Every structure is written in C-alpha cells, then in structure tokens.
C-alpha cells in the first residue's frame, strides 16, 4: 500500500514537471524511479502534442527507456548545455542540499545538473529530512588502485562498504567505476565540508552530496505539490 502511495506521488510530480517542457528544449533525464515516471510523462506529451525536444540520459536504464518511448536522444559526447534537467534525490535537507546516487549514476547525474540552466528535483515528502545522513552517501571510485583509495577515505574517518550486484560481484557503474557507500553515525550537518574533503582524494571520481542551485518539488499523500528554490 505504501509503495503504491509513493508511486502516485511520483506520477503527480512527474506530470507536473513535464508541463515545464516546451518545444526546442534540450533536456537532461535523471535516473531512478522518479525520473522514470518523468520520462513516461514526457513521452506522453511528445506523442500527444507533437512536442519537439531532444534529451541526454544520465544512465543506460534511462537511455533504454527513452529510446523505447521514441524520445529523441543526443550524443552524450556532444552537448554543452541543457535547458532543463529533471531528476530525483535520496534525501533533501532544509537548505536543499541533497544525497543522490542511490541508483549508481551520480557522476553522470551531476554532469547533467551542472550543465542545465534549470534543474528540478522531484521527491515525495518522505525524502525531506532535517539533516542528511540516514541514507548512505555513494562515492564513485576508480577501479585502479581502489584499495589505496579506500584507505585514504578511512583515514579521514569515513566508514563504508562496496556496493554489490545481486550476484555478489562488485557493482560497476555505466562509466565503468565502482561504488563505495559511506555512512556516518553523526549524520552530515555540513555536507559542503564532507564533499570538499572526499572529492580531493585522487581516485574519488564523484561524491553523492549535491549542493547546486536547484528547485525541489515535493508531493504529499494527497498529491499536493510544494516547490522550494535554492538561492
């Protein structure tokens, strides 16, 4: 029942976000279950309104779904800016700082967020938290020298574990890297400091803290949408 409720919230958010798309836009498609609903809503508008847009997908899963739904896709090596990126998040604090990357696509997701003139993050209200840290923070790690990289991370006081596939093998991202999920018993009241320390480690390719200028749209169980804007 709770799963169905969250799905309803995601669909409401996705359809509202799709109304922000106009012909001629180049869009960034996020990853995860909420971004998936946005891709469906976008495809519906393209099919019913002859909307002319192009998109860049942040993951192979989003790419495959967009292609299946006949959303025109661009070469990810060729774009320089985006009009709008729509994605989800794992946690959002009152300052709209986020933890993202639960699906393992944080490196590509951040590229799309930073390239976009406007970014909309869609979450159900359960993702709004007073302080970040209940959700583990994914680090995208180089496969080369991974054990040495983890030693540096632990030296800074962070504990974690390698993300695994269902087979028990190490999870490999679409960019052919590993994911190391860190956790903190004290949460992250100052994620900017944690982000700066971690990203300076050579071999840490990306960190799942997101501190960008974004709009966060949240929905409650009644389908009411609240919009907040970072400054």
From Swiss-Prot:
The keyword Isomerase belongs to this UniProt entry's keyword annotation: yes
GO molecular function: ribose-5-phosphate isomerase activity
Record: residues binding substrate: 31-34, 87-90, 100-103, 127
UniProt enzyme class: isomerase
Alphabetized SUPFAM superfamilies for the sequence: D-ribose-5-phosphate isomerase (RpiA), lid domain, NagB/RpiA/CoA transferase-like
Keywords, alphabetical: Isomerase
Pfam families hit by this protein: Rib_5-P_isom_A
Functional pathway: Carbohydrate degradation; pentose phosphate pathway; D-ribose 5-phosphate from D-ribulose 5-phosphate (non-oxidative stage): step 1/1
Residue pairs linked by disulfide bridges in the UniProt entry: none
EC number: 5.3.1.6
Keyword Isomerase: yes
One GO-annotated biological process of the protein: pentose-phosphate shunt, non-oxidative branch
InterPro entries given in the database record: NagB/RpiA_transferase-like (IPR037171), Ribose-5P_isomerase (IPR050262), Ribose5P_isomerase_typA_subgr (IPR020672), Ribose5P_isomerase_type_A (IPR004788)
Domain of life (superkingdom): Bacteria
Stated family: Belongs to the ribose 5-phosphate isomerase family.
PANTHER family xrefs: RIBOSE-5-PHOSPHATE ISOMERASE 3, CHLOROPLASTIC-RELATED
Function according to Swiss-Prot or TrEMBL: Catalyzes the reversible conversion of ribose-5-phosphate to ribulose 5-phosphate.
Protein name: Ribose-5-phosphate isomerase A
């Amino acid at each position: 029942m709770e799963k169905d409720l969250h799905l309803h919230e995601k669909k409401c958010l996705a359809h509202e976000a799709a109304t922000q798309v106009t012909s001629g836009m180049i869009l960034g498609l996020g990853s995860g279950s909420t971004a998936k609903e946005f891709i469906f809503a976008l495809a519906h508008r393209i099919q019913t309104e002859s909307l002319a847009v192009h998109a860049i997908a942040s993951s192979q899963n989003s790419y495959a779904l967009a292609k299946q739904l006949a959303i025109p896709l661009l070469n990810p090596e060729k774009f320089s800016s985006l009009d709008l990126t729509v994605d989800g998040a794992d946690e959002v604090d009152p300052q709209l700082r986020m933890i993202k990357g639960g699906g393992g696509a944080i490196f590509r997701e951040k590229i799309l967020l930073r390239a976009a003139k406007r970014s909309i993050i869609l979450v159900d209200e359960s993702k709004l938290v007073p302080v970040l840290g209940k959700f583990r923070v994914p680090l995208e790690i180089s496969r080369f020298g991974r054990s040495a990289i983890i030693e540096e991370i632990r030296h800074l006081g962070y504990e974690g574990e390698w993300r695994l596939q269902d087979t028990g093998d190490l999870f490999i991202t679409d960019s052919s890297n590993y994911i190391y999920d860190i956790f903190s018993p004290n949460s992250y009241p100052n994620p900017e400091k944690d982000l700066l320390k971690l990203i300076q480690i050579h071999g840490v390719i990306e960190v799942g803290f997101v501190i960008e200028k974004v709009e966060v749209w949240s929905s409650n169980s009644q389908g009411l949408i609240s919009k907040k804007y970072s400054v």
